[in-house]
């Protein structure tokens, strides 16, 4: 069941074309189905009993990056990812989500990441900040993590990294919406980070987004604050603790 607030956004978006030029998926495929308007129209039809939520519709809801380009450009404040994410919850609950998606969900539930592999550990002690590496950087672009830690060391920042870093919930939340399983992941992650007593520097902006926007809503706010790695390094540059090469 899609909540009334999400349906309200869908009903408004189904009349509007103003963000169709911003969707990267629609640009790539050329399909009207990939515009936020079309997805809003589909859910409106389901709500009015004019269409059933079937596998084809579920697949359409997964043809979205949840990048928020549409939301950021909306002059009236509507949020297509809100109803698209809830449509994904409906797809999973109704057992019409694509098999490939269900496999990724299984991977996240067993390993904490969509790749289905053991996450490398970057564990180290530190006293100034705790760096949250995240799943993508740890597994797919480890050089990003290594370079960030090297920069912090050069700036004299004592950075702690958890030996067993919990999943933030962002991957599962993107795949199946903000369900109870996602909130439980968030609670575990927030509790673990809060136990360090240190401010959190987050390497992946997607992890930072869920930590700053959803964790407080779910009652598991990170007490010492969250900063993205880019913002933290920018501050170090401003404070002359790092110098950019010409």
Functional labels for PLM-detected ranges:
Residues 1-61:
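Ferredoxin-type iron-sulfur electron-transfer modules and their immediate structural context
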Residues 220-245:
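Short, flexible loop segments at boundaries between secondary-structure elements
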Residues 10, 40-219:
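Iron-sulfur-cluster electron-transfer modules
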Residues 17-20, 105-112, 176, 225-230:
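Short linear motifs at secondary-structure transitions and domain/linker junctions
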Residues 119-126, 238-246:
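Short boundary motifs at domain starts and secondary-structure transition points
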Residues 1-2, 197, 246:
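Intrinsic structural disorder
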């Amino acid at each position: 069941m899609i909540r009334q607030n999400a349906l309200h956004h869908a009903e408004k978006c189904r009349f509007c074309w103003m963000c169709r030029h911003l969707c990267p998926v629609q640009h790539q495929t050329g399909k009207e189905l990939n515009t936020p308007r079309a997805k809003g129209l589909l859910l409106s039809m389901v709500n009015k009993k004019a269409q059933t939520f079937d596998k084809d519709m579920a697949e359409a809801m997964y043809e979205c990056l949840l990048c928020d380009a549409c939301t950021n450009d909306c002059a009236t404040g509507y949020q297509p990812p809100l109803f698209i994410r809830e449509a994904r919850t409906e797809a999973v609950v109704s057992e019409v989500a694509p098999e490939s998606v269900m496999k990724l969900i299984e991977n996240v539930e067993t390993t904490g990441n969509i790749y289905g592999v053991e996450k490398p550990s970057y564990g180290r002690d530190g006293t100034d900040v705790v760096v949250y590496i995240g799943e993508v950087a740890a597994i797919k672009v480890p050089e990003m993590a290594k370079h960030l830690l090297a920069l912090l060391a050069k700036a004299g920042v004592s950075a702690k990294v958890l030996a067993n870093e919990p999943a933030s919930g962002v991957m599962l939340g993107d795949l199946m919406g903000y369900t109870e399983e996602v909130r439980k992941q968030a609670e575990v992650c927030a509790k673990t980070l809060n136990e360090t007593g240190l401010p959190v520097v987050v390497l992946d902006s997607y992890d930072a987004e869920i930590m700053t926007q959803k964790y407080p809503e779910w009652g598991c706010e990170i007490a010492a604050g969250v900063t993205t790695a880019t913002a933290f390094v920018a501050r170090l540059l401003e404070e002359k603790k790092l110098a950019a090469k010409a």
